[in-house]
Amino acid sequence: MVRAKRKLDHIEYALSTGQSRTHGFHDIDFVHQSLPNSNYDTITCETKIGELSLSSPIFINAMTGGGGEKTLHINEQLAYVAKHHNLAMAVGSQMAALKDESEAASYKIIRKVNPNGIFFANLGSEATVEQAERAVDMVEANALQIHLNVIQELTMPEGDRDFTGVLQRIEKIVLNSKVPVIVKEVGFGMSKETMQQLASVGVTAIDIGGQGGTNFAAVENERRQRMLSYFNNWGIQTATSIIEATSTNNNLSFIASGGIQTALDVAKAIALGANTTAFAGYFLRILMQDGIEKLVDEIDLLHADLKFIMTALGAKTIEELQSVPLVVKGETYHWLTQRGIDTTHYSRR
């Protein structure tokens, strides 16, 4: 019951706290192309995460589940939207259902709505190999997300305080998983060092989960008597984290998430090196405040606007979008310079 109540609290506070932190994409400028040699009607948006082929570089990221009928209804609606637009979708952490079988329905609903969809199971880094297998089977998942949420746990009144052995547990899951494993942050970004460690144990796909989206430190602080306010602005901005990711030179697929709200955000994230982008809080807010049809319409507009931007840049495919010239400036440039990461190759390609 405590876990289910926490799930509902997360939805309430995520909607009320909003997305107040910057994601850094304002520091990224495309180099205008006066002769793009492109046609809007022939632009294609297919992409891949590792060996998973996706029809769109937009997917619905992990949000909820395990909070009774309310979270079941949210996942049901999100699965409908995913089916309508042929988008991949992740569920929220399934540990609630592994602890309490009665909560499994709030996750299994997605397969009932969209039997042929691409879905990602989701567990925290405390999960065992056996729990990972059960989570994948629960939703007949095409991939498994393992989320890293140290700051959220530290801020959570009842959260974990011991993070030893995480990399070793992830390695065991990767070695034993029958589906691809995606390791993701939850709004605090990832450093190049973290990504190199993950690559060293066989992880091939990473969701950088940058600062700029739902602020889970702020969400958990709303649930505390004594706030740990110093965590509210903690983390690496999304744009910065994508560039840190690409600087590792590992054979990794990258998902950009963390405050992604517009087609321009999507285009910039992909041009920086992401293979795809993920939306969570922005989609949830539209769904809860304006309804499912409004969310369906918003995704239509996102795809149309992305194609407009790709046409302007002369990028006929997502792969070509990953190589258009752009300039990194401002605080993002300063951070990366201090970190020893050269960004000039972006502007000269």
From Swiss-Prot:
Cofactor: FMN; NADPH; Mg(2+)
Flavoprotein keyword on record: yes
Pfam families reported for this sequence: FMN_dh
EC number(s) per entry: 5.3.3.2
Reaction(s) catalysed by this chain's protein: isopentenyl diphosphate = dimethylallyl diphosphate
Protein residues bound to substrate: R6, K7, Q152
GO biological process, alphabetically ordered: isoprenoid biosynthetic process
Keywords on record: Cytoplasm, Flavoprotein, FMN, Isomerase, Isoprene biosynthesis, Magnesium, Metal-binding, NADP
Top class in the EC scheme: isomerase
InterPro entries in the cross-refs: Aldolase_TIM (IPR013785), FMN-dep_DH (IPR000262), IPdP_isomerase (IPR011179)
Family statement drawn from the similarity comment of this UniProt entry: Belongs to the IPP isomerase type 2 family.
UniProt function note: Involved in the biosynthesis of isoprenoids. Catalyzes the 1,3-allylic rearrangement of the homoallylic substrate isopentenyl (IPP) to its allylic isomer, dimethylallyl diphosphate (DMAPP).
Quaternary assembly: Homooctamer. Dimer of tetramers.
Name of protein: Isopentenyl-diphosphate delta-isomerase
Record organism: Bacillus cereus (strain AH187)
Recorded name of the encoding gene: fni
